[in-house]
Amino acid sequence: MTQSTQAATSLTMTRRIKGKREDVFAAWTDPEIFKRWWGPPGTTTTAAEIDARVGGAYRVTMRLPEGEVVYLKGEFLEVDRPSKLVYTWAWEEDGGIGPESRVTVAFAAAGGETDVTLIHEQLPSEESRDRHSHGWIGCLDNLTEMFSGKDA
């Protein structure tokens, strides 16, 4: 894969969240908190299983606005509490598993707030990158709202 192809199939986002790093990290690893903010607008996260340890698995069940239920799953490759998560990402598709990509989320203390930097790489295409970008913006908007006191 060339450098330009790698850049074309990855995305990076940074968001400042009004919460302590430990609390923001927990929002990614505690299933009950996670379900409150995960997903783009109109999507409901109905179940989340999260075993946030190296080699641990996660599986998320989401209901899309049009009613379709989709499943996301992966494995934690790195868990550095409360600084960093690295995990694989794959959609369950047609009874199988779709292409696997990789997500890195870094949590940096910024006074009483937290800078969250997200890198989603190894996406299968530019179209996939664009769809995931839309989803991540919605997720981070919800997370920001939840920590601002306006529950997502």
Where would I find each of the regions flagged by the language model?
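Beta-strand/loop substructures that line and gate deep hydrophobic ligand-binding cavities in soluble
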Residues: 86-137
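A short, structured loop/turn motif at beta-sheet edges
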Residues: 21-22, 51-53, 77-84, 106-115
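Short beta-edge strand/loop motif at the mouth of beta-sheet-based domains
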Residues: 12-13, 32-69, 151
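Helix-adjacent hinge/juxtasegments
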Residues: 59-81, 87
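Hydrophobic pocket/interface hotspot
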Residues: 24, 34, 58, 76, ...
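Hydrophobic/aromatic beta-strand elements that line small-molecule binding cavities or substrate pockets
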Residues: 15, 48, 72-78, 101-108
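Hydrophobic ligand-binding cavity/cleft-lining segments
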Residues: 1-44
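Intrinsic-disorder/low-complexity, polar/charged segments enriched in Ser/Thr/Lys/Arg/Asp/Glu/Gln
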Residues: 8-14, 21, 45, 57, ...
